[in-house]
């Protein structure tokens, strides 16, 4: 396990798509934290003080840059008509949203994460003892 924790942040603007209305720009903060080396966080600005966070696999983001990836709550794929755009769909019991994002911005963010944790070396950053402590009940009596 590595102890030299790193958090990467990148801001972007995704376009929220809705039928028969113009796209709405949404501020997004992308985060990568070596304490959870398999995941990325996309935090979407929902208003003056609100953010909604989605956590998904770093591999899902990488795979979605080149082909349709994901099943269920998060799917990512290149746009059919524009190779410079990636479509991100998010689904939850409270709603469904479709965003378009710059493929280059997402690729640049991923490259920065790979500079910190090389794909395939994520396990070197996982603190198994800490993870078990959080999962197991503290009172085992």
From Swiss-Prot:
Belongs to the SsgA family. One of its GO terms (biological process) is division septum assembly. Transmembrane segments: none annotated. Interacts with SsgA. Interacts with FtsZ (via N-terminus). The keyword Coiled coil applies. It is found in: Cell septum. GO terms for cellular component: cell septum. This is Sporulation-specific cell division protein SsgB. Its main location: other. Involved in sporulation-specific cell division. Required for early stages of sporulation. Important in the process of growth cessation prior to sporulation-specific cell division. Recruits cell division protein FtsZ to the future septum sites and tethers the contractile ring structure (Z ring) to the cytoplasmic membrane during sporulation. Stimulates polymerization and filament length of FtsZ in vitro. InterPro entries: SsgB (IPR006776), SsgB_sf (IPR038658). The keyword Cell division applies. Pfam families: SsgA. Keywords: Cell cycle, Cell division, Coiled coil, Septation, Sporulation.
């Amino acid at each position: 396990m590595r102890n030299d924790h790193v958090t990467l942040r990148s801001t972007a603007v995704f376009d929220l798509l809705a039928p028969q209305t113009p796209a709405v720009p949404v501020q997004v903060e992308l985060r990568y934290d070596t304490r959870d080396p398999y995941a990325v966080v996309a935090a979407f600005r929902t208003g003056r003080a609100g953010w909604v966070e989605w956590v998904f696999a770093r591999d899902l983001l990488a795979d979605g840059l080149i082909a349709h990836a994901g099943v269920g709550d998060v799917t990512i794929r290149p746009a059919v008509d524009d190779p410079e755009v990636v479509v991100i769909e998010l689904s939850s019991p409270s709603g469904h949203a479709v965003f378009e994002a710059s493929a280059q911005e997402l690729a640049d963010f991923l490259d920065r994460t790979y500079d910190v944790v090389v794909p395939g070396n994520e396990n070197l950053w996982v603190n198994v003892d800490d993870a078990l402590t959080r999962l197991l009940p503290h009172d085992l009596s």
